[in-house]
């Protein structure tokens, strides 16, 4: 079982190379038209399985379609990856939508709403006291 340093190095290499493949080699207009970024890579300890989390500027419905397209093209992506890096075995890959950004934006929106509501209540209290 590889140590954490090796996992980090291989994950970093995979992220770099897959990003280049998505930008240069993949013939998919949907992916090219939207800014697709790899936010995180989860690599199994035996280096055999890799979950790739992506973010995009597209709305949720389009992001799901992008993930479907990436998972459809994963064999060609994996093949390109095998040509670019030296590994005994290129890991099986699966693409997933990274919803952390959406959740963070939702939390920020809720905080803004609470702040505005609190400010409105303070204004109403001051008007009532006057």
Swiss-Prot record:
Signal sequence region: none
One family name in Pfam for this protein: RBFA
Function (record text): One of several proteins that assist in the late maturation steps of the functional core of the 30S ribosomal subunit. Associates with free 30S ribosomal subunits (but not with 30S subunits that are part of 70S ribosomes or polysomes). Required for efficient processing of 16S rRNA. May interact with the 5'-terminal helix region of 16S rRNA.
UniProt xrefs under PANTHER family: RIBOSOME-BINDING FACTOR A, CHLOROPLASTIC-RELATED (PTHR33515:SF1)
InterPro entries linked to this entry: KH_dom-like_a/b, RbfA, RbfA_dom_sf, Ribosome-bd_factorA_CS
GO terms (BP aspect): maturation of SSU-rRNA
MF terms in GO: ribosomal small subunit binding
Localization, UniProt: Cytoplasm
Subunit structure: Monomer. Binds 30S ribosomal subunits, but not 50S ribosomal subunits or 70S ribosomes.
GO cellular component, one term: cytosol
Protein name: Ribosome-binding factor A
Alphabetical keyword list: Cytoplasm, Ribosome biogenesis
Similarity comment: family membership: Belongs to the RbfA family.
Main location: cytoplasm
Species of the source: Prochlorococcus marinus (strain MIT 9301)
Cell membrane among keywords: no
Keyword Signal applies: no
């Amino acid at each position: 079982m590889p140590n954490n340093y090796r996992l980090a190095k291989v994950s970093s290499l995979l992220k770099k190379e897959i990003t280049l493949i998505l930008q240069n080699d993949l013939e998919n207009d949907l992916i090219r038209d939207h800014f697709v970024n790899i936010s995180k890579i989860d690599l199994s300890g035996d280096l055999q399985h890799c979950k790739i989390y992506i973010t995009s500027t597209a709305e949720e419905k389009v992001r799901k379609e992008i993930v479907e397209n990436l998972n459809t093209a994963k064999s060609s992506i994996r093949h390109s990856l095998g040509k670019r890096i030296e590994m005994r075995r290129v890991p099986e890959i699966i693409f997933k939508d990274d919803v952390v950004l959406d959740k963070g934006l939702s939390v920020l929106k809720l905080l803004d709403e609470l702040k505005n509501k609190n400010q409105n209540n303070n204004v109403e209290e001051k008007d009532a006291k006057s």
